[in-house]
C-alpha cells in the first residue's frame, strides 16, 4: 500500500532533507523511524528537498509498505521513534497514482525575518535576524514583479540542476507582524535557493539600498551575479504543498506555530 504523511521539522542541525552517507539528514531519520514501525526497510519520496538549516511545517512524503498498521502506529508510533525536532502531523492512505513530488501542483514557503537591533535568543534557529529599518510595504510592492511564469535565472543557485529556469509564481506577499517581516510566496515549483535569493534582493529594496524596480530589472538581466547575496537559511519554512482535490489530503495551519496564521 501507499501511505502519505505530513511532516514538520526543525532543520537546524541537519545537512538538509536528503539522505547522505555519514551525515545526519531529515530523510534518514524519518526512514529509520518508519522502518522500525513497519518492521521492514522503508524509503520515502518528498514534495520538496530543503537545504541545511531550512525548516518545514507542511512537508509531504509518501512511501510503499507491506505492513498493515493503524493510523496511531503511523503517527504516534513513528513520532516515538523520531528525534524531538521531527514530527508526523497527519497520515493518509493514498492510491498508487499519488506521488509526493510529481502530483504536487504548487509549493508555498514562508521566510521569517526578525527585524530588531539585537539578535534573538530563544528563536535564533527559527528566524533570520536582520537589523536596520526594513520597509515591508516597499518589499511587497517590489515583489509583485515576480508574478507569473518567468525566467528566474537571476535567482537560481549556481549548482541548480533544473533543466529550465522558468517557474510560475502564483502569489507573493510581504507583511509585518511587530518585529517580524514575513515573505510568503507560492509557485508551481522553485529552483535551488530561489526563495532565499529572492528574499536577499527584496531585503536590499526594503532597506532602501535599491529602487522599487530592481526585481524586474534583475529578472531581465538573467544573471545571478547581479542580484543580492542569498538570505540566511534559518528563517525559511516549507509551509504547504498543493495537490489535486481527488487525493483529499488533510489541511492544517501553515505555521510556523509562533506566528499568527
From Swiss-Prot:
One of its GO terms (biological process) is tRNA pseudouridine synthesis. It is an enzyme of class 5 (isomerase). It comes from the Bacteria. InterPro entries: PsdUridine_synth_cat_dom_sf, PsdUridine_synth_TruA, PsdUridine_synth_TruA_a/b_dom, PsdUridine_synth_TruA_C, TruA/RsuA/RluB/E/F_N. Substrate binds at residue 109. The keyword Endoplasmic reticulum does not apply. One of its GO terms (molecular function) is RNA binding. CDD domains: PseudoU_synth_EcTruA. It holds the Pfam family PseudoU_synth_1. The active site is at 51 (nucleophile). It catalyses: uridine(38/39/40) in tRNA = pseudouridine(38/39/40) in tRNA. Keywords: Isomerase, tRNA processing. Its EC number is 5.4.99.12. PANTHER family: PSEUDOURIDYLATE SYNTHASE (PTHR11142), TRNA PSEUDOURIDINE SYNTHASE-LIKE 1 (PTHR11142:SF0). Homodimer. Belongs to the tRNA pseudouridine synthase TruA family. Formation of pseudouridine at positions 38, 39 and 40 in the anticodon stem and loop of transfer RNAs. This is tRNA pseudouridine synthase A. The gene is truA.
Amino acid at each position: 500500500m501507499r501511505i502519505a504523511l505530513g511532516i514538520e521539522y526543525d532543520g537546524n542541525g541537519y545537512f538538509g532533507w536528503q539522505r547522505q552517507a555519514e551525515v545526519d539528514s531529515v530523510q534518514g531519520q524519518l526512514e529509520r523511524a518508519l522502518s522500525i514501525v513497519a518492521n521492514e526497510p522503508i524509503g520515502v519520496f518528498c514534495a520538496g528537498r530543503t537545504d541545511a538549516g531550512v525548516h518545514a511545517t507542511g512537508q509531504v512524503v509518501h512511501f510503499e509498505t507491506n505492513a498493515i498498521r493503524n493510523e496511531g502506529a503511523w503517527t504516534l508510533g513513528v513520532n516515538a521513534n523520531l528525534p524531538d525536532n521531527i514530527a508526523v502531523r497527519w497520515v493518509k492512505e493514498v492510491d498508487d497514482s499519488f506521488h509526493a513530488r510529481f502530483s504536487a501542483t504548487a509549493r508555498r514557503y514562508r521566510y521569517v525575518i526578525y527585524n530588531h537591533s539585537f539578535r534573538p535568543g530563544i528563536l535564533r534557529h527559527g528566524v533570520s535576524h536582520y537589523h536596520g529599518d526594513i520597509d515591508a510595504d516597499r518589499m511587497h510592492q517590489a515583489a509583485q514583479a515576480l508574478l507569473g511564469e518567468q525566467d528566474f535565472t537571476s535567482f537560481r543557485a549556481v549548482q541548480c540542476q533544473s533543466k529550465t529556469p522558468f517557474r510560475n509564481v502564483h502569489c507573493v506577499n510581504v507583511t509585518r507582524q511587530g518585529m517580524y517581516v514575513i515573505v510568503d510566496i507560492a509557485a508551481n515549483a522553485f529552483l535551488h535557493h530561489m526563495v532565499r535569493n529572492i528574499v536577499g534582493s527584496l531585503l536590499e529594496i526594503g532597506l532602501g539600498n535599491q529602487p522599487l524596480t530592481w526585481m524586474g530589472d534583475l529578472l531581465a538581466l538573467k544573471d545571478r551575479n547581479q542580484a543580492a547575496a542569498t538570505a540566511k537559511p534559518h528563517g525559511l519554512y516549507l509551509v504547504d504543498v498543493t495537490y489535486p482535490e481527488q487525493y483529499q489530503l488533510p489541511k492544517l495551519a501553515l505555521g510556523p506555530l509562533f506566528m499568527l496564521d
